[in-house]
Amino acid sequence: MILLFTYIKLMVLLPLYYFTEYEMIFDVLLLNIKKSGSVLIKFCQWSIPRLNEMYNLDQKKIQKLEELYERCNFHSMEYTEKIYQKNFHESIYKKYDSIEEIASGSIGQVYRMKDKEGEAIALKIIHPNIDCELRTFQYILYLINLVKPIRDSIKYYFPINLTVFLEDFNSQTNLINEANNNLLFASMYRNNEYIIIPELITVSKQ
């Protein structure tokens, strides 16, 4: 319900900013996009370069929107501990110490930590509630498609294939796919001293 309310706020803010171009409205819009979850943030990341090519967007606004790439909201350490326990059937602290957040992206966040021998390790965890957020996003798209004037306007001004986006998003939310890509590149560049692919230790979907 909270997520749906955030989408409703965005639907009000978008046309309001379009007709006024007030900087404050843009900042509030950006804040609400960050609160709306992984799907909409990734959708913005995915669509902004395409729209920029089509419409030559204001570069100052593009720079602000770059916050959506590297400065997304962090989820809690408690959630990370829970997901690690669920997937590997042991506490994260059994093997690792000095766990600290490095960065948070649209789909997951990365930690730096050390194993018991002191070797540095990176850990990536998918953000919570992504399945729910995806269903909400698809429901909003369904409702938009029911209103012909809105649907036609979006297709005219925003000619982007949403099916491709949703397939790409689903692929990225499964870390096993990322692990397979890691192994593929490690094999491809195993004899190249200038390209170092991180060694994969263990993996789960989340």
Annotate each language-model stretch with its function.
Residues M1-Q206:
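Broad phosphate/nucleotide-binding scaffolds in NTP-utilizing and phosphate-metabolizing enzymes
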